[in-house]
Amino acid sequence: MYVRHMRELLLLKENELQRLRVIRRALTDLSATGAATMLDLSPRQVFRLKAKVRALGPRGVIHGNTGRRPAIAKPATVHNRVVTLYDREFYDYDITHFVEALDEEYHLPVSYDTVRRWLRAANSGPRRHRVCVHHRHRRERRLRFGEWLFLDGSPHHWLGPERPQATLILATDDATGKPLYGSFAPQETLNGCFQVLYHVIRQYGLPGALYLDRAGQFTTTRHGGTHVFQRDDKPTHFEIAMQTLAVQLIFADSPQARGRGERINGTFQRRLVPELRRAGITEPEPATSYLNDEFIPGIARRFGVAPKDPSPAFRRPPAHLDLRTVLCAKSTRSVSNDNTISFNSQTLQLLPTRYCPSLVGARVQVQEWFDDTIHISHPSTKDEVRWRVWN
């Protein structure tokens, strides 16, 4: 409300106007104690307000800092630079990620609320999407590092909106929330999952259990949405490999059941995509290198937590074991009279060795490694058999 004083027109807030009315009464017929009770102030504060109103008139009830620039306010140059940086270079970052980048790359320590206020005033910044939230119970984290890993694929336009959609296959520890290794592939395939596990086991060891969805490469699925174990179900190549390594498989029935892993995927989609864009990376191989060398270590430092039990649950694999011979799809073939086998719509000619000139009638094991190479082993000696594609 506007109040005229002398030749000046003052704009008072409602609480300031009420304070002025009471103080004016205190200057005539109202006691200081009564005014203090009405304004929820101490008598000493009322005496100070009476003195200010006598000296300044209605301006005496206005706070002294009103209209002043705060001492901690950022300069206009910083404000303009932050808004310009977001619009030109960081337009696909969320605000938290943008604040971190300002501090780390440009040494501009600006708070989240300040940046958010500046961007909203400039009609910029990310647009929030309202999500319908349902009540769910939080599951406690596992106690030990390596006790339980999430392995999941996240399809997204990771390499840019104009690039084909790719899938990030990511292994994440449940106890610490730290991502361990990831790889980009066209789809979430068996070989892609084996490749990620190979790097995890090489670097950390064998985990206690894997928490997975019911994708076809992990377990046998039925049509019509029924995921019921039946007697005629045969184990998948993935289940056979994990059984060999004594790694337990735990299957989730919905994305909500894998909430912690799904949130990690969401964090990667918000943060990794703009970082790959700024780095000029548009191909899967360099994106995988950047992911594991730069991005994952930073995410682990920023969001990882300490496990409740400091002793790790990872186990060392046997020293003599070549993991590639376990993390693969295995099948058997009968050798024909001309020392050939049929595999993947091709005829493979088995080549003789010094100690085994012929394998006619034998059953050999064919392994498809995750690097898409084919390896054939002798049925009795397990030695590798050389071969070539028969034309």
Give short role names for the model-derived ranges:
Residues G34-L39, F98, L102:
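Short alpha-helical "recognition helix" segments of helix-turn-helix
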